[in-house]
Each structure stands twice: as C-alpha cells, then as structure tokens.
Amino acid sequence: MVAILKRLGFSKLIVRWTAQFLRERKVRLKFNNITAEERVQLVGVPQGSPLSPVLSIIYTSGLLHQMKNWNNSSLGMYVDDGALFACAEEWADVDKLIRARYTVCEEWLRRSGLAIEPEKTELIYFQKQGVAFAMPAPTRLRLPMPSHSTYYEVIPSDCVRYLGFFIQRRLKWKTHVTIMCNRAKASAMALKLLGNTIRGLSMANWRLVLNAVCLPVLGYSCQLWYVPGKSKGLIKQTQMVQNLMVRMVAGAFRTAPCEPLTHITRMLPMEQYIEKLTHTSTLRLYRLPRMSQLLRRLGPDWYSPCPGDNALAVPDHLPSRGKSKQHPTVLEALARRVPSHGPKVDWTVIAPWEIPIWAAQTSHWGVTNPAARVEWVQSLVDIGLHSGVEVIFTAAKVTGRDLEGTRELIPVGGASVVSQRGSNDPSTWKWTMGSEATQFDVNAFALAKAVEVLASTYAAGVMPPPVIYIFSTDNSALQAIRNPRSIKAHAHCIRFHKALTTFFLTHRDVRIILAWSPKNDELRSDLLACTLAAEASQEFPPEGMDSVQSAAYQKGRAKARAFEQWERQYRHNRMQEEFRTTWLGTVIAPPRFCYQHAISDPPSIHHHPLWKEATSLTKKVAGQRRKPKYTRCTTSTALQLAVDHAFTGSYARRFRPADPPETHLCVCGPVLRDPAHLLTKCPLFHQQRVDAVIITNHRTLSLRQLFQSHPERLLAFLQAPGIARPPPNTSQQEWVEEEADTGIG
C-alpha cells in the first residue's frame, strides 16, 4: 500500500501517516452497546472505518488501468465487487473475451495478495428481445483457477443481483420490482407491532414511519425502470403495496377503497411519487465534480473539456436497423429532465481543510420571541443614531410575472439592502435576481449582496464601525449562508465567503452579527427595504432576465406537477364514474358515498380538513410533551365512516351477505344502521351530538359539514363509547377478523 502511494505521487507526509495507520492495527467490535475484547488486526483495515473505502480504491486502482487497451469489454469496480462486461457477434467470441479478461484480472489480484471467490462468481448472458431465430446462450462458462491448476464452471443465471439491483437477462425489471415490493410489504407487516386500529401509533406517526421505511424500498432504482406512460404494470405492483400502507395509516378494512383513503391521507399515488422522485434525484447531477465520468458521458452540454482532457466518451447514436432514431440511455433520459445550465456545485472553490478567516468574527442570532426581537431592533436603531452602530436590513420579494405572454406566472425575485449608520440618511441598493427562484434563494441572495456592499463600501481605507448588524426575516437563509460548503445556496454562499474574506483582510477587529428579525412596518428602514425589494421584483435588469433555475425551485415544481397529475387523474376518474352511473346504471357504492359527503375537492398540496384535525396535537404546555388530540380508535373510526367501510349495517349488507337481515338494522328501531343514521339521526346518541355541537338550535349538521367543515365536532362525537361498533346480535370476533385481514388489527 505504501509503495502504491509513493508511485501515485502522494506527499511524503500522507505516505508516512498511512504507513503508521496500517501498522499494529487493533480492533474492538461493538454490537448492541456490547464491546468485545481488543484483538490484533494483522492484515487489512476492518470494515466500517471511514478510511477503508478510500484505501481500497487506491489499492485496486492499478487493476482498472489494465483495461485501458481493451476493446468490446470493460471492468467496473465497487470496493470489493467487480463486473466484467464483454460483447461480440457470436457467443463463442463472448466466452473467449470474458475468459481472457478474467485471466488478466485474476493474475493481477493474485500478485497483489488478493483472490477471486469462485463460489461468489455469477454469470449472465444478455440477449435482445424479439430477435427471430436467435442462437441460445451457452449453458456454462469455464474459468481458470491457476492456484489449483484447474478450472471451475459457472452456470449462467437468468437474473443476478449487483449492488442491490436485480438484473434480468433481457433487461426486464419485473423481477427487481417484485422483490422490492415483497421487501416493502414484509417491512410493513413487521411494523404491525407498533399498533393497530385501537391503540398504538397515531395516524401522523404511521404515515411518517411507513414513508420512511417502506417508500424508499418501493422506489429503489426506479430511475432505471420507470418510463412515463410505459411502466403501468410495474407501477401497479408498487401501488398494491402502497394500498396496504394507506390502509394501515387510516386503520381501514381490507375492502376499503384506497383511492379516497389516499386522498384523505395525502399520500401521493405511486405513479406520481415515482415521477417526482425520478425528477428530484436527477438534480444530483448538479453536485457531481467537474471531472465526473457521468458528466463526460452526457456530452458538451454538461461537461466543459479542459486542455489535456481525453475525448468525450459520448457514443455516436446511430439509428438501429428499421428504426428512425436511437433510444437515449437511462442517464441521458434523466439528464433531459433538468436544464444543463442549472446551479452546479463547484467543490474545488474551497479546500476541505480551509477555515474561513471570518468564522470567529461573525455570529448568528436565530429565532426568538418575535415581539421581543422587534422591540430590541427598534431600540438598537434608536441607539445607533447616536453611537455610530451600523444596522443593515435585507429584504427579498418573489412576484409572479407573465414574462412570455402565455399567462403563466413565473416567479421573479428582487432583493434590497438598506444600511443605516448614525444619524445619516439610509443608503439603499436593490437588484433583480432573476426568474424561477424561491423565496429562500432570494433571501440568501440578499444576504450575499449585503456583504458585498460592505466589502466595497469599506475598501478604500474607510473605517467601519466596530459592530455591524445584518437582519433578515429568513433564519434558514442566515444559517445556510454562513456555511461556504452549503449545497442549498452554493453560489450565494461562495459570494458571501469571498466578500467577507476581502472585508476581513483589512478590518480584522470588526464584529458582524447576522440576526433574525420579523418584518416590522413601523420601522422606517425595514419598510423601505421591503418596498425596494418589491420594486426590484417588477423590473427588468439591463443585462436581461437571468433564469436562476435553483434546485429548490425545481423540486417545488416537480412536487407541484405531481399534484397536478394527481388532480387530473382524480377528475378523469370522477368523469368515468359519472358516466357509468348515468348511462350504464352501474353504482359503485363506497366511492359514491365518500365523494358525495367526505371529499368534494380534488387533491392538492393542502391537507384534507379531516386529516388535519385528526392529526392535531394538544396545546403546548411548558414542561409537557404534546400528545395527539384524539385516540387511534377515534381517528380510525372517522376514516372508516368517511368511506362507509365501518361497523355499519350498510357495510354488512354489501360484504357480509350471510348475516341475518335484522343485524343490519339499528338497535333504536327498524332503520338501516348506515353512517348517516349513526352520525345525525340515531336517538341513542342524541346527547352526544348535543355535547359535540353537532345539533345546534334544533339544526343538525350534514355529513358534508361534519367531514369537511367541522371535523373537530365529528371526532369529538366519535370519542363517545359505543358509536360505530359491531351490533350486539353479531359476533364481534367475526368483525374483528374482517379488520384483522388488513394486517393492522
């Protein structure tokens, strides 16, 4: 290892440090807070060390150089996993090529003190789909084993696992998606230990846990297999698992319709979720280093060659026989989702070991009591009129403007800075940042410009005051701007860093305080800053409008598009349902009930009123932890009634036809025990309705009002015992089993 570092040109200091690090290694294993005895590590570095992957890459780098003259074959390495790839016209040539490349790798590893494990070696032959009279792939491959002067055979597999991907020989992704769905379903079923429909986690916590544990498994590697409009079968598989998750969150029966429950719980359907995930994951291209092989394969739009660089590894996409154009690769298809001129992150601007010279001279004052901070800022401004303290107010405004004449409002950001020092008139600056930016982007831009103003104002020998206050209404921007390696506002952080570095090179004794302060229209300077920012957001800069296309803006747009697609699907389904009901005479009872009473608006980024109230917490009390306002049993019953899949006679009549007809009736009389009767008419619960303010002035709230306008009254009513419970004439165990089939009861 030391010899390799010397040959690669590492400094003597790093070589000596690595040599000492690898010498006389001792290891202590820790598992479940139990630490084992210390033992000597004679060879290698144990897994888990942050330095292990770095040393592994350096040690095996020579193996990758072995393929620089290879043709029609390649070698890929990921720590201790390697993949040999070869292509040819005939299977015999493929076998010959693979065997030759394997021999080269085996010899290099053996000379380096490493070895290939034959029992872990896998083989797969890829074959095009739909090729007539295609020659079948070989049934085995013989590979040399020089250490034993023999060979071993590898049987080709129809599907192999590599780095978590299950790759099929015809590049079909059904096997991979099926395995991921089974894993997500198993995780969801294991989470049943956390509660059921009576007790346990609240609905909000159920959604949080399932989204954190199961959704990442369902969406793993979706960027490889998802094609908009062409992956319906795979999407359907993942949607079935999500339906289970939705029922677990809502505490619903296994027969409950999932579409309205998904609407109420605001869990994006899998098609929209995967579309959003695919788009947002593409934004990682902006964070890749300039020399990344991924960017090189995307061509000149993403990669700018420097003198001495090799030719771009971008193939000429010649059309296949019988086709007018070549399909893009997965990487190219992903890159087309985002603009190539977006905000890239340059990791080489600041060295990892560099400590800004201004770090010790700047402070951050975060969010506190708004009234107290406003009063303090007012007193600071009053004192500054006589003491010479400089106070700087930053403001930012995002205004929707029709820039292209298409009636589509595009957000345009404007920023301003107002500086007040002593009794002098305030100095003002304003800028138009550009279009397609978020409020956070403009706030960070305003802070960076404020520091640039400081650096330019006090550059020509002008002495600044000993303390300078910079105020902003966005605490997240204040926190991000102080981190020169921030990803959220990278460009603004670099400008902030360079300006402060320039400022403190000549003024080392000045202290700068970045403080949060709410908007205060009674303060002249603050009001002036807000006015100037609003004016800047309406102007056109002389050099033209810059398209910012920040990552935060693109994430927000991806989320908005996902909900727009969901809304279109919702309206399409309602039109189909109306057509079936009106012209075909088909009545789908559960959706008709919920869309008639509980759901009247299409899905949006806002929560359904019933969900918002059901997940609310108790009031904040000093020294006490906030708890869910309603019990799990109450919230589950509310959602069961919303879709008419509850312990009611209307549900039993549809799904329990073997029950006697009299069990469908209410105890109060010969009336069907449906949600409308239980919630608004049953005389047995009249007093509970009065207590929950469902009946006021001899007027009873309608079901629509209960589910959408006054869900707090519905939930207060359902907290009374005995409501929407199994009838006394029916075995409760049978009803519980119906619920238990969902895996949540």
Please give the residue ranges for each predicted region:
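Basic, alpha-helical interaction scaffolds
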Residues: 149-225
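Helix/loop segments that flank and initiate small ligand/metal-binding modules
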Residues: 20, 379-386, 548-672, 698
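RNase H-like nuclease fold core
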Residues: 36-37, 351, 355-460, 482
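Short, conserved micro-motifs composed of acidic
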Residues: 34, 100, 115-158
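RNase H catalytic domain
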Residues: 82-88, 230-233, 398-401, 447-531, ...
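Conserved pre-motif C helix in the palm subdomain of viral-like polymerases
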Residues: 1, 41-70, 105, 211
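Family-specific functional microsites
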Residues: 502-508, 604, 613, 618-745
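Active-site palm subdomain of RNA-directed nucleic acid polymerases
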Residues: 37, 53-89, 460
